[in-house]
């Protein structure tokens, strides 16, 4: 980010004196100096000597290829790119969000030695923004046909392999984390239209390898995983994610593999048939494809949505319905025990549900809601429909069931009330819900019996059971006890003793719920043990989610804000009912294992009672036979019922080339998707074996990749003097996997089991971009951010007015964010201000040596001792910098793809230069600093080595 920076002066320090006892950090220092990534002592503060260029630490320019420096450094950095002297590096092409880096060059296109290379080694002449002018599609009206001579596999270029020396690129160029995956290079005629939208974008559907090995031996030799990541929905609400819809209910599917027609098929036999791109079978083209039944006119076939877009949604005919569309049902199961009353949880939840009633999807007016209060008894509520005549109006009544051994659901009407027809009575109940139990002193919570009763109530319809609890279940079936954390935390048997389910009831019950089309979501909020490891089985097997709020109390406004926003977002999310996901692959490719929150109904069918919008799924693939075709295809289909009662199928199609050389496979490997794969496998090992095994698996997998690359793809063997080389498109993989071992889910040492279990759940269900944030937090330097940061991006909009004139007007875009810096204390100045985004929380780190003017602008005080630290919010002050800072925080918090809201933790650094922060506050800040600094994953945190040390260890192992 270029631009002017606010001139907050730095404190002046003697050149020979280290700051805040941390020593000066840096690269190329004298032997006695503290080096990059060395252990940081939280109580000692942050290193103080600012490095040259520390505000922009070795970040790639937006237009640089993998591993390349910014534009003004290109002349110095050519050697690091491994580009021939007569080649010039090209800008990184910013692929639109709707495309997969799909390149469809002309058949037989060579790569002349003097031709410029694109960002991944693909010739710039066929880069996406130029391809429409380069391709020159010709041939039959509906694309290439198999009746014609097909280009040989070698006739189109693969991504070229460029290597990087990781030890020479420190700090690692974290801007690479924002790059798209290596482009998928397909031959001319691979799609019907040649448009980028013909192949699924990586946001929806991506493969760990954008060139797939042609046999299993080559895959095993590569040590790279083969899997696809499916993320069918990008936003919580339909209006934020317009996906093309096929509305005429005309669906053409392959007779053999049952895949759906898509832009990557081929028309043959004078366009009367289409050849499946998965199994190669020829199918008849439906007669209605060329005819509009509404206008009774012949139409252009190529105008059909499913032939132009790889991500589409079909409105399904009645043949796709097992039963009539059911209404959307929300059954709220609320903890009414004394603890939930005393900490304000029950009152907060009831008020939030009341305020969110208008946001519940109810387009067709059929949504229903019900409520069950739970202590040692079950409290049901009959909610009559509203009446305009007060004389005929019925009141809401509460029915109590005390027998927990054989729970009988009352045979009363209106236990599930229609939201639209009973709106007033529902509001009255929620307004008075707390008063029903305000004098309750019952400390017990019978969750198991409540779940069974709720299941009986809605199992004929399906829907959601949303559980709000602040108490460990301790009555009836499924009662849990507190585990011995002290004896097992941080030890070899931690997984089996603390992270495994403590009662088999919850998993078996979850499977029954899945069969009945019932999803269970958990909102757990307490200052005491909740047994997240056991209770999270309910959402895991019913396609729900676990939400965890440790140390929650209504006495803190920030806690109320977070819980309320997340409940509201959850209730406003468009959900799909009675859904199944199936992923198909070309001949020779088998879907081998499935990861995510769902239940495997059969070997290749994943069942979702309700399909969430904020999760993703990973499918591991095996190669069962030698692949002779030049291309492989995958197709994911989600059959579901919308919240407004329409049966639909969302279809995503992805095609990738087949390679027979190891360099082709490595040059097209997707480091983020591979990280996702290894994360799922590590979670699996942590739960089935041990945390030690999970960490060893990650380290061993990475070492295997380095060994293969050195042995097979690096020219020559220089022994101990050889650099640590890896291809450019994988050079962030070591950083990500090493950082993953320091994440709270895997780090060694004592971690509360609820926190660790919750972190494992997040890793196992989060989309890639959020997952990467958990593993490698984003840090923004705020005290020196450019003047445009914190303000809306200045854009222009062009339109034609009523007079037919073209008009261009300025409009505001998104808030501009500063460029991220590396996760290391070497780049944190003691006078600086930094925002750390961990994915779950935000940390505003205030350097202990911050100048008074900065403190005044941000907090309205000139002494750090007066700053409200911990969970807090910035005060709204009447100055530009404060407003920009709040804009940055709000922008980071935004997310149309997630329900979570991040609390802000204000952390004050330590200083030896003045005594602005009293000793009592310094003691309070120590654990907060430890928590904040645990996200500096390039340093020695979380019981692990610094990143530089880690790379040197790998280098030594490779040389031994």
From Swiss-Prot:
Protein's membrane topology: Peripheral membrane protein
Protein's cellular compartments: Cytoplasm; Cytoplasmic vesicle, COPII-coated vesicle membrane; Endoplasmic reticulum membrane; Golgi apparatus membrane
Keyword Transport included in the entry's annotation: yes
Keywords: Cytoplasm, Cytoplasmic vesicle, Endoplasmic reticulum, ER-Golgi transport, Golgi apparatus, Membrane, Metal-binding, Protein transport, Transport, Zinc
Residues where Zn(2+) binds: 254, 257, 276, 279
Ranges where the record places region Zinc finger-like: 254-279
GO CC annotation terms, alphabetical: COPII vesicle coat; endoplasmic reticulum exit site; endoplasmic reticulum membrane; Golgi membrane
Biased composition range(s): Low complexity: 27-39
Gene Ontology molecular functions: SNARE binding; zinc ion binding
Chain residue ranges for the region called Disordered: 1-110
BP-aspect Gene Ontology terms: COPII-coated vesicle cargo loading; intracellular protein transport
Bias (Polar residues): 52-61, 76-102
Main location: cytoplasm
UniProt keyword Endoplasmic reticulum present: yes
Pfam families, sorted: Gelsolin, Sec23_BS, Sec23_helical, Sec23_trunk, zf-Sec23_Sec24
Family: Belongs to the SEC23/SEC24 family. SEC24 subfamily.
Protein's job: Component of the coat protein complex II (COPII) which promotes the formation of transport vesicles from the endoplasmic reticulum (ER). The coat has two main functions, the physical deformation of the endoplasmic reticulum membrane into vesicles and the selection of cargo molecules.
Subunit structure as annotated in this protein's UniProt entry: The COPII coat is composed of at least 5 proteins: the SEC23/24 complex, the SEC13/31 complex, and the protein SAR1. Golgi apparatus membrane; Peripheral membrane protein; Cytoplasmic side.
Protein name: Protein transport protein SEC24
């Amino acid at each position: 980010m270029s631009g002017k920076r606010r001139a907050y002066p730095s404190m002046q320090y003697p050149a020979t004196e280290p700051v805040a006892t941390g020593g000066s950090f840096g690269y190329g220092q004298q032997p006695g100096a503290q080096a990059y990534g060395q252990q940081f002592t939280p109580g000692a503060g942050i290193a103080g000597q600012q490095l040259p260029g520390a505000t922009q630490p070795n970040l790639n320019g937006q237009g640089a290829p993998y591993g390349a420096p910014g534009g003004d450094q290109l002349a110095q950095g050519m050697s690091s790119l491994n580009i021939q002297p007569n080649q010039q590096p090209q800008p990184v092409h910013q692929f639109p969000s709707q495309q997969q880096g799909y390149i469809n060059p002309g058949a037989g296109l060579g790569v002349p030695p003097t031709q410029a290379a694109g960002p991944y080694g693909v010739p710039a002449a066929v880069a996406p923004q130029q391809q429409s002018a380069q391709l020159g599609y010709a041939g039959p009206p509906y694309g290439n046909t198999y009746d014609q001579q097909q280009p040989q596999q070698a006739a189109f270029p693969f991504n070229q392999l460029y290597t990087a020396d990781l030890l020479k690129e420190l700090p690692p160029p974290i801007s690479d984390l924002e790059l798209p995956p290596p482009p998928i290079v397909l031959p001319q005629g691979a799609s019907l239209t040649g448009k980028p939208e013909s192949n699924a974008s990586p946001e929806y559907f991506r493969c760990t390898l954008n060139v797939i090995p042609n046999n299993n031996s080559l895959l095993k030799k590569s040590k790279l995983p083969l899997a696809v990541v499916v993320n069918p929905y990008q936003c919580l609400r339909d209006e934020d994610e317009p996906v093309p819809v096929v509305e005429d209910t005309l669906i053409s599917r392959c007779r053999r593999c049952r895949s759906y027609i898509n832009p990557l098929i081929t028309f043959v036999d004078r366009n009367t048939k289409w050849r499946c791109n998965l199994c190669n079978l020829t199918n008849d083209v439906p007669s209605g494809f060329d005819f509009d039944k509404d206008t009774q006119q012949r139409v252009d076939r190529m105008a059909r949505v499913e032939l132009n877009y790889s991500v589409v949604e079909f409105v399904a005919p009645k043949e796709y319905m097992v039963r009539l569309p059911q209404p959307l049902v929300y059954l709220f199961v609320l903890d009414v025990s004394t603890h939930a009353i005393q900490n304000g949880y029950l009152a907060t939840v009831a008020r939030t549900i009341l305020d969110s009633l208008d946001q519940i999807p109810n387009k067709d007016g059929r949504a229903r809601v019900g409520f069950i209060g739970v202590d040692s008894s079950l409290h049901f509520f009959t909610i009559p429909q509203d009446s305009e005549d007060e004389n005929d109006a019925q009141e809401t009544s509460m029915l109590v069931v005390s027998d927990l051994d054989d729970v009988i659901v009352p045979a009363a009407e209106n236990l599930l009330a229609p939201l639209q027809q009973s709106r007033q009575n529902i509001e009255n109940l929620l307004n008075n819900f707390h008063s029903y139990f305000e004098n309750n002193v019952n400390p017990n919570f019978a969750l198991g019996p409540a779940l069974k009763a709720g299941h009986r109530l809605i199992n004929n319809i399906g829907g959601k059971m949303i559980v709000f609890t602040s108490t460990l279940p301790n009555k009836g079936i499924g009662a849990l006890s507190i585990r011995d954390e002290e004896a097992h935390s941080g030890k070899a048997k931690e997984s089996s003793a603390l992270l495994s389910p403590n009662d088999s009831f919850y998993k078996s019950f979850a499977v029954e719920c899945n069969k009945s089309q019932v999803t269970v979501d958990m909102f757990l909020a307490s200052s005491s043990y909740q047994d997240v490891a056991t209770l999270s089985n309910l959402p895991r097997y019913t396609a729900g989610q676990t939400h965890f709020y440790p140390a929650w109390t209504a006495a803190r406004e920030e806690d109320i804000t977070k819980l309320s926003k997340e409940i509201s977002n959850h209730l406003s999310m468009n959900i799909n009912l009675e859904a199944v996901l199936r992923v198909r692959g070309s001949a020779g490719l088998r879907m081998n294992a499935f990861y995510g929150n769902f239940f495997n109904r059969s070997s290749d069918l994943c069942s979702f009672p309700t399909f969430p919008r904020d999760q993703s799924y990973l499918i591991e693939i095996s190669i069962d036979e030698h692949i002779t075709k030049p291309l492989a295809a995958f197709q994911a289909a989600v059959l579901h019922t919308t919240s407004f009662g329409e049966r639909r199928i969302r279809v995503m199609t992805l095609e990738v080339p087949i390679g027979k050389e190891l360099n082709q496979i490595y040059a097209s490997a997707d480091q983020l998707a591979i990280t996702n794969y290894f994360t799922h496998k590590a979670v699996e090992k942590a739960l089935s074996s041990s945390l030690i095994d999970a960490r060893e698996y990650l380290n061993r997998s990475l070492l295997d990749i380095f060994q293969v690359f050195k042995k097979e793809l690096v020219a020559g063997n220089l022994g101990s003097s050889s650099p640590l080389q890896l291809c450019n498109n994988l050079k962030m993989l070591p950083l990500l996997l090493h950082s993953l071992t320091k994440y709270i889910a895997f780090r060694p040492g004592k971690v509360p089991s609820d926190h660790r279990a919750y972190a494992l759940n997040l890793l196992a269900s989060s989309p890639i971009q959020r997952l990467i944030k958990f593993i490698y937090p984003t840090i923004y330097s705020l005290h020196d951010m450019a003047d445009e940061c914190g303000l809306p991006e200045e854009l222009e909009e062009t339109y034609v007015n009523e007079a037919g004139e073209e008009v261009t007007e300025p409009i505001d875009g998104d808030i501009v964010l500063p460029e991220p810096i590396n996760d290391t204390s070497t780049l944190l100045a003691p006078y600086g201000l930094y925002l750390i985004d961990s994915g779950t929380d935000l940390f505003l780190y205030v350097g202990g040596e911050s100048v008074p003017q900065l403190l005044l602008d941000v907090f309205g005080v000139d002494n750090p001792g007066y700053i409200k630290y911990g969970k807090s919010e910035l005060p709204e002050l009447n100055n530009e910098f404060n407003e920009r800072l709040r804009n940055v925080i709000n922008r980071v918090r935004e997310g149309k793809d997630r329900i979570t809201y991040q609390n802000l933790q204000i952390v004050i650094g330590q200083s030896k230069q003045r005594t602005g922060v009293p000793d009592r506050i310094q003691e309070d800040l120590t654990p907060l600093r430890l928590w904040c600094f645990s996200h500096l994953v390039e340093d020695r945190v979380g019981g692990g080595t610094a990143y530089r040390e880690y790379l040197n260890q790998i280098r030594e192992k490779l040389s031994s």
